[in-house]
Amino acid sequence: MMFKYGLMAVSCGMALGAAQAMAAVVGGGSSLPMKLYGTAIGDGILTASYPGFQPYIGRSSGEGKAAFFSNDATKLRLAAGTAIDYAGSDSIVSLAERDAYNSSATVGRASFGPLIQIPVAATTVAIPYHVSGKTALNLSSAQLADIFSGKIQNWKQVLFGDVRGPDLPVKVIYRTDGSGTTQILTTHLRAVKPASVPGNSINFATAVGFNPVTNAPVGSTYIGVSGSEAVASTVANTDGAIGYISPDFTDFDNAAVVASVNGFLPAGAIVQLTLDTELPPTHPSSGKDPANPLDWVPTFPNPSNGYPIIGYTNMIFSQCYKDPADTIRIRAFINSHYSGQNNSAVTSHSFIPLPAMWLSGVHSTFYNASSTLRVGNPDVCNGIGRPL
């Protein structure tokens, strides 16, 4: 078995080498995992020599999905005509997006093969804050909903331990782009207190039910920014600020930097217990369909234990690619990542590796030669695929 595995690895490596000059697996989207994926050649799990994707374009989940579903590179601020091979998104593919893909005659299933959506890593959404002189903050989920909806407007309305906070306006730092991080946050806040946060969306204004620029509650303060890096820097440089962010852009286990929610910091083993409550579609008891991309990404609106703002960051592919080099590299990523080879990298970026059952389920479904859903299946991809 080891000899066979070695031969397979050598063969795959040779194929990757032969494809090196022509390969250009291009994509982007969510800024949440951009450091993990790699924004320069060799600095991430996608841009390493194996599998050798092009640098990830970190923008927002909404922009990544828009570029992928329309095959329009300009939505990621790339040159027009560049083929988009995948998207990174913390925002789950919607029923409408899936159905539009399936029914499209030009940029969907008929041309590119079935849609694939797979989780890459679990993530918390951290709540960074900056209140001068304060080094610990614990908020309930309900308080958090009231802060982001403008009902709590001053830190004197909040206790820091047993001491009331200073007379200082709360400054909410929110994402103005189509952010999957926003969607994970508001999915939880809506589940806990829909009177304050009536929606869950990649659009902050849609989720809270008002435009923070033109129609914010009287007395509230909102500062809109684009991207995870901007959230981190704005909170750090603004007294009274609070925001929400990828754990990879902040010191997520430091109580002086990020708030505890319901008594828990974003780091913690209890998050793994929450993830283990969901079975992958390949499990016979899951009640899910492996061929349905919507069934591959569960949500956790209000976990019963541990840190409550959690979700998955995902990748979106098509099954078919016209460039054999693209197929080789995408399959190489699926093989390595879902064999657990990137688990240490995932952890080092403050994310949580997928449960073993999920790793195995993705690998057996979208990589194994016996699966009809595998990327590059010639029986499905004969004459079709995402363009060169």
Describe the function of each predicted region.
Residues 1-22:
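Gram-negative bacterial Sec-dependent N-terminal signal peptides
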Residues 23-388:
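Flexible loop/hinge segments at secondary-structure junctions
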